[in-house]
Amino acid sequence: MAQISESAAIPRRTANHHGNVWDDDLILSLDSPYGAPAYYERVANLIEEMKHLLLREMEDSNHDLIRRLQIVDTLECLGIDRHFQHEIKTAALDYVYRCWNEKGIGMGSSDSGSKDLDATALGLRALRLHRYNVSSGVLENFKDENGKFFCNLTGDKRVRSMLSLLRASEISFPGEKVMQEAKAFTREYLTQVLAGRGDVTDVDQSLLREVKYALEFPWHWSVPRWEARSFIEIYGQNHSWLKSNINQKVLELAKLDFNILQCIHQKEIQFIVRWWRESEIAQLNFYRKRHVEFYFWVVICIFEPEFSQSRIAFAKICTVATVLDDLYDTHGMLDELKTVTEGVSRWDLPLIDDLPDNIKIAFQFFFNTANELAVEVVKKQGRDMIALLKANWQRYVESYLQEAEWIATRHVPSFDEYIKNARASSGMCIGNLIPLLLLGQLLANNIVEQIHSPSKIQELSELTIRLIDDIRDFEDEKERGEIASAIECYMKDNPDSTVENALNHLEGILHLSLEELNWEFIKQDTVPLCCKKFTFNIVRGLQFVYKYGDGLSISNKEVKDQIFKILIDQVPIEE
């Protein structure tokens, strides 16, 4: 690499990011009625009623296996499964697992000789997600002599079976060829059905909407809150496998639960808005204002009331990280950035006294927020973890300085060199660690080692976050004058490759990494599930907000509408 002199500087560039698309006063004016005790009482009563009704529904059927799986799937899609975890495990999944074998299952426990694709696919998906040991090899039983998947059913039942198979195929681990085959087959089949060119016509409209959702938002692109809002709108009173009185109660609970959670989330985003407005950084136009979008990213993934502190911490960290990103990418001279990096390394605020005011304000914003969050972590965990937090902030800003030096020297590193640095600059080293420590679990040192770098799940989350950003934001970053990206570095290592070749290569790495992440998330170990779920869902959340491009930097389009649906627009409830 070329030698960089102390006087070398990055020209002060302009990123031309759009301003805050949200009126903070509008956010602060939100006042949902769903915090009232009467709504909580109604939800509690509905939960108790439904526990008895659903247990009876599971048992009162010749198709007791698929009925149990349909109930579990419905509760999960509507976002209310957390109220029925005991019933889901003991009455549904334990029961299904006892009937499971290498050839699959039928619709009922009495159908020992008849295997059903819909029931088997639903079971494979649900059992895997709940950490039962089931093999994808069971799907080989649903291939014909030519190795093609088949389904003997017709009409809506055929479409439903293909949809269940698609959703099961997404919960794949590395090397599972049958899952890749199932995914390719069902996506093609359902795409044809949705276009009206399939072998089934006059498909139920609610079912078609489910198909559309599954094709538009595969599992790694879907998130719990968006799925719940979407399925509340899809879910009708015509779910023939549930009695009408249960249908009504399921839908009422889903709507009330969504609105009550939305009320809680509105109070949290109001807290974030006030925190932002009270900081000096809010008065500067140098930096992106995306505090609402960052809160949205985390709340669509981790929505339960008990994780409020982690959500707020994540939104704060991302807001600070974006200020640092803009500083290192756009506004800072190289000598200034070296001073900032040294200030973080030494945790020394006076060190930056001679820097321009906009940089001092940014550093003060970082310094205050990092210290406040460190105090919260120490209180929650009951021991001093300051050194660990400082080390990860240092790793983060040093990766930014490395990128700034590449820009200053017009240096494009090798792909491996870039990825090594990019893992740190993804921000997951700090954006994941602090919220995990605030989830409410006391985490022993050996557990922290299993969830934090260089653990496998942490390394995979860092890699996937960086690849998602580079793949979706490549053109915009190039226009802003950034030299090194995964695509540029791959093309340097492979001079004959095109941008399309590079993108295909990165998509392949991303796909494999997501399958590995599936395994790390689902495998049995000593790490608390809430910790693995947070890490895993944050990756899914970024896929979601980046689906149509960089939805965090360019948030005035699809993401703005999604934020409105999740945080502002109540689900209508008929009185």
From Swiss-Prot:
Mg(2+) 3 binds at D469, E477. The keyword Cell cycle does not apply. It holds the Pfam family Terpene_synth. The keyword Lyase applies. Its cofactor is Mg(2+); Mn(2+). A motif (DDXXD motif) lies at residues 325-329. Mg(2+) 2 binds at D325, D329. It catalyses: (2E,6E)-farnesyl diphosphate = (+)-delta-selinene + diphosphate. Pathway: Secondary metabolite biosynthesis; terpenoid biosynthesis; Terpene metabolism; oleoresin biosynthesis. One of its GO terms (cellular component) is chloroplast. GO terms for molecular function: magnesium ion binding; terpene synthase activity. Induction: Accumulates in apical leaders upon wounding in both resistant and susceptible to white pine weevil (Pissodes strobi) plants. Mg(2+) 1 binds at D325, D329. (2E,6E)-farnesyl diphosphate binds at R288, D325, D329, R466, D469. One of its GO terms (biological process) is response to wounding. Belongs to the terpene synthase family. Tpsb subfamily. Sesquiterpene synthase (sesqui-TPS) involved in the biosynthesis of sesquiterpene natural products. Catalyzes the conversion of (2E)-geranyl diphosphate (GPP) into delta-selinene. Monomer. This is Delta-selinene-like synthase, chloroplastic. The lineage of its organism: Eukaryota, Viridiplantae, Streptophyta, Embryophyta, Tracheophyta.
